[in-house]
Amino acid sequence: MLADMRWWLRHGRDNGYAVPHFNVWNAEMLMGIMDAAEEARSPVIISFGTSFVSNVVYEEFAHLMRTMAEHSAVPAVVLWDHGRSFEIVHNAYRHGANAVMRDASRLPFEDNVSETRRVTDYFHPRGIPVEA
């Protein structure tokens, strides 16, 4: 089942457990992680990011991640990790991510804060959590 990352992170904090987060590079990793999460009956965050784009076309892989999350017996979040631009995280959202991470750490501090505000102003009203 596709899950809201904010809800599960709060629930974990309030109940003394962590929600595991795995960067996924290919279908075999994705299936192994989802099988393990279901066996453990644990919510899970599966992510894909800019570092992995050369390995797989995101639009195609995002569909597989989203489909597996939606059909999972446990809560699963699809997170785009370390997006280097607004356009990258927006594209990930359009193709199935239900959480995004905008990495503006290479910008000067004030620009980083401004960019983070721009991203959160766009995504939060759409119910999409932002890690920054």
Question: What does each model-found stretch correspond to?
Answer:
Residues 1-20:
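N-terminal amphipathic alpha-helix/helix-capping segment at the start of soluble metabolic enzymes
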Residues 5-6, 27-72:
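Glycine-rich, positively charged N-terminal anion/phosphate-binding segment
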Residues 18-23, 44-48, 76-82, 100-102, ...:
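Hydrophobic faces of well-ordered beta-strands that scaffold small-molecule active sites
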Residues 28-31, 54-62, 84-91, 104-131:
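Active-site-adjacent beta->alpha loops and helix N-cap segments on the catalytic face
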Residues 40-42, 94-100:
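Glycine-enriched alpha-helix->loop->beta-strand junction motifs that scaffold or abut catalytic
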Residues 72-75, 95-97:
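Structural recognition of alpha->loop->beta junctions
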Residues 80-85, 95:
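Long, hydrophobic/aromatic-enriched structural stretches that serve as scaffold segments
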